UniProtKB/Swiss-Prot annotation:
EC number: 5.3.1.9
GO molecular function, one term: glucose-6-phosphate isomerase activity
Domain of life: Bacteria
Gene3D superfamilies named among the record's database cross-references: Glucose-6-phosphate isomerase like protein, domain 1
Pfam families the UniProt entry points to: PGI
Family to which this protein belongs: Belongs to the GPI family.
PANTHER family linked to this entry: GLUCOSE-6-PHOSPHATE ISOMERASE
Gene that encodes it: pgi
The organism of origin for this protein: Mesoplasma florum (strain ATCC 33453 / NBRC 100688 / NCTC 11704 / L1)
Keyword Cell inner membrane: no
Protein keywords: Cytoplasm, Gluconeogenesis, Glycolysis, Isomerase
A GO cellular component annotation in the UniProt record: cytosol
HAMAP family on file: G6P_isomerase (MF_00473)
Record's protein name: Glucose-6-phosphate isomerase
BP GO annotations: gluconeogenesis; glucose 6-phosphate metabolic process; glycolytic process
């Protein structure tokens, strides 16, 4: 369901260090590398708790019938994967019953105040997601939203409208939820935040949204079954090895390029996955993203003629659109675009992909890796999640870093807590 095309990358199979790929594969399978206690995601699509899943379906169905808006409260891996899935699968301007909106991913007072105003008089529920319950952004957002919901519907009714996804037995959020009677679902101990979208972190909100999560798991299982080879016939490993080869050739940044607006947050999720997994020990590609053709009208000039040997592109090419439209002829043809009449928007978009790759690669000397996707749907989303997760494990180990920790984020947190006067921080 994802094919890696390297014909525009400037790389040959000989450049991809297959011998090292095979060694790293053994590390992953045997769980002998750094961070091996966070490899629970590898078997998760087949081994997740089916009893908990059925309970999630029941609670989600009940909540869905009571609300028009679900506010998910979380940040990082407790935010990006949910939004990536919802927008890729349901689209941006959908008309489904339940709207999903987000809080706890920013400390902007303006955003929180406007969100509060928007929710006044609306039937809304809350899914708060945090392993510890002490993360600043979701913590303060949940305080405000919980208070507002209780004021709107009362304490007893709120117990059926608030769900927590958190630790199985400990932590501030687990304690709060148990004390107040909110249902809880479990964030596994052996799966890090950026790998958690297929756990209750992502699955519960998506169930409330009405997404077919069985199909998401089916896609992930298909990826598990297909991406088993320990060599470069494994498409995920081929992608990881190619980006590693370009890094070793001196490239500093990788831009994930999508031509579909509803994949914007898939790219945001990908940035966290690769940025937190690889950006350590003064190593790692800087992950960025662009949405074409939109960003061709802003960043296209830099990509075409800016500094060379800094950036390469990884282009997502979707073969089948979710929906399609034809360009109609106009009698006056004021814009001179009648030559496109009868063509579909997707055909024009696909042609743009080919033209842009040709311009960036052959004229601009910008390496391109192309990832060919079948379509944008629930099965494909499950597949791409597993594809990128196994790819980043390989890529991180090729880089000889621990792909499963993120020690660098503690520095800014310490400084912020010190300035805010958090007890115990000096």
């Amino acid at each position: 369901m994802i094919k890696v095309d390297l014909q525009h990358s400037g790389l040959s199979i000989a450049d991809l260090n297959e011998a090292k790929v095979k060694k790293v594969h053994e590390m992953i399978i045997n769980k002998s590398g750094k961070g091996n206690d966070f490899l629970g995601w590898i078997e998760w699509p087949k081994t997740f708790d089916k009893k908990e899943y059925e309970e999630m379906k029941k609670v989600a169905s009940s909540l869905r019938n009571k609300i028009d808006v679900l506010v998910t409260v979380g940040i990082g891996g407790s935010y990006l994967g949910i939004r990536a899935a919802d927008e890729m699968i349901r689209g941006i301007n959908h008309s489904d019953k339940v709207q999903v909106i987000y809080a706890g991913h920013t400390m902007s007072s303006t955003y929180v105040a406007q969100l509060s105003e928007y929710l006044k008089g609306k039937k809304f529920g809350i899914c708060v997601i945090s392993k510890s319950g002490t993360t600043t952004e979701p913590g303060i957002a949940f305080r405000a939203l919980e208070k507002q919901l209780i004021e709107q519907v009362g304490v007893e009714a709120s117990k059926e409208l608030i769900v927590a996804v958190t630790d199985s037995s400990k932590g501030a959020l687990k304690t709060l939820a148990d004390n107040k009677g909110y249902p809880t679902f479990v964030i596994p101990d052996d799966i890090g935040g950026r790998f958690s979208v297929l756990t209750p972190v992502g699955i519960f909100p998506l169930l409330v949204a009405g997404v077919n999560t069985d199909n998401i798991f089916a896609g992930a299982i298909k990826a598990m079954d297909e991406l088993v080879q320990g060599d470069l016939t494994n498409e995920a490993y081929k992608y990881a090895a190619a980006r590693n080869a370009l890094y070793n050739a001196g490239y500093k940044a990788e831009a994930l390029v999508a031509y579909e607006l509803q994949m914007q947050y898939t790219a945001e999720w990908w940035k966290q996955l690769f940025g937190e997994s690889e950006g350590k020990d003064n190593k790692g590609l800087y992950p960025t993203s662009m949405i074409f053709s939109t960003d061709l009208h802003s960043l296209g000039q830099w990509v075409q003629e800016g500094a060379r040997n800094v950036l390469f592109e990884t282009v997502i090419k979707v073969k089948e659109p979710v929906a399609n439209m034809l360009v109609e002829a106009d009698t006056d043809n004021y814009d001179g675009l009648n030559y496109l009449s009868g063509k579909s928007f997707h055909e024009i978009n696909s042609t743009a992909i080919e033209g842009v790759i040709d311009a960036h690669v052959n004229t601009g000397k910008m390496p391109n890796i192309v990832l060919e996707f079948d379509k944008m749907n629930d099965v494909q989303f499950g597949y791409l999640v597993y594809f990128f997760e196994i790819a980043v494990a390989m890529s991180g180990y090729l880089l000889e870093v621990n792909p499963f920790d993120q020690p660098g984020v503690e520095v800014y947190k310490y400084n912020m807590f010190k300035l805010l006067g958090k007890p115990g921080v000096k």
